[in-house]
């Protein structure tokens, strides 16, 4: 079974990568992955904003039939009984991980990625959280992981993980850069699964 690494980047246009003709910006690592792997040349975003677009990708449902219809603070998420790309691959013997931005609605618990097929999750739980590269916390498999970063005082109310816009803010103390933590976690997941097929999203 082939390993699958699916990179979903918000606001990344078709022509932004070298492998699709970009001449000014250099994207050598992504270009190499595309050359060694598979390129999709006829694909549309499920929606114009991130949460429903991610829901459509993961569930395979048309935008009109997914429960996540927009970016909202309401606790609307993919339900645990809903089939997802991760749950199907998990059932086929894959080790599955979501590392980075979950951003599929606003869960009222932090196990939503794990509940819908991911063995492992480490990252931002919602879109507001993901707007800060130096958050005060991240989520790992349903648990809050405190970081050494600190947001400005005006954003302190949003650092309660149970707040609907949890994680929102601008850091004034910047010690741990979240994308670096995601890279480290991704590499560890790949190393741990050398002998198993894996799906890394």
PLM region descriptions:
Residues 1-201:
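Formylglycine-dependent sulfatase
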């Amino acid at each position: 079974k082939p390993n699958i690494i699916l990179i979903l980047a918000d606001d990344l246009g078709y022509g932004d990568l070298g492998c699709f003709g970009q001449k000014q910006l250099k994207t050598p690592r992504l270009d190499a992955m595309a050359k060694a792997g598979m390129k999709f040349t006829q694909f549309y975003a499920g929606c114009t904003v991130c949460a429903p677009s991610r829901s459509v990708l993961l569930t395979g449902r048309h935008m009109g039939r997914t429960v996540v219809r927009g970016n909202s603070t309401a606790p609307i998420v993919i339900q645990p009984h809903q089939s997802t790309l991760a749950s199907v691959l998990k059932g086929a013997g894959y080790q599955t991980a979501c590392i980075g931005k979950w951003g599929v609605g606003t869960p009222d618990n932090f196990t939503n990625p794990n509940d819908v097929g991911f063995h492992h999750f480490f990252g931002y739980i919602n879109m507001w959280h993901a707007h800060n590269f130096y958050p005060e916390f991240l989520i790992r498999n349903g648990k809050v992981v405190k970081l050494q970063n600190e947001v400005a005082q005006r954003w302190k109310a949003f650092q309660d993980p149970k707040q609907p816009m949890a994680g929102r803010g601008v850091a004034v103390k910047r010690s741990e850069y979240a994308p670096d933590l995601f890279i480290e976690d991704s590499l560890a997941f790949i190393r741990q699964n050398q002998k198993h097929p894996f799906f890394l999203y």
